[in-house]
Amino acid sequence: MNTPVIEMRNIVKRFGNFTANDGINLTVHKGEIHAILGENGAGKSTLMNQLYGLLKPTSGDILVNGKKIVMNNPRDAIDAGIGMVHQHFMLIQPFTVTENIVLGTEPTKGVKLDMAAARKNVVEISERYGLSIDPDAKIEDISVGMQQRVEILKALD
């Protein structure tokens, strides 16, 4: 069998005396789709936040393509090819679609921000995935459905 693209081994996450994840194992192979199901408070978001670098496991290992990695922050996850569509939107309302998608990964031209390149990138990924959206629209002016598209495009960028 081929190497899993993502493996979470014996993940434990504690917050003080409360154990949110207790020995969780998850293996994902290329092309698979998984659903993480459970009641409110079951630890689903906590588990995914560890995979995305928003939280550090108390113990356990995360492997990407067979290599153990440490997720210190979301940038580490993104660099490892992991994106996350958040349950609660992580968008800055007064910013444009483009500004929200490239936030933290802004293209530069010398020391200046290259918003033309950023906008072009947003148009390209939205067309590639069939998620058309106005790259210049402000988040506060678009529907919740369009905001969800922005979250998806952020994960795909």
State what each model feature region is.
Residues 1-157:
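Glycine-rich phosphate-binding loops of nucleotide-dependent enzymes
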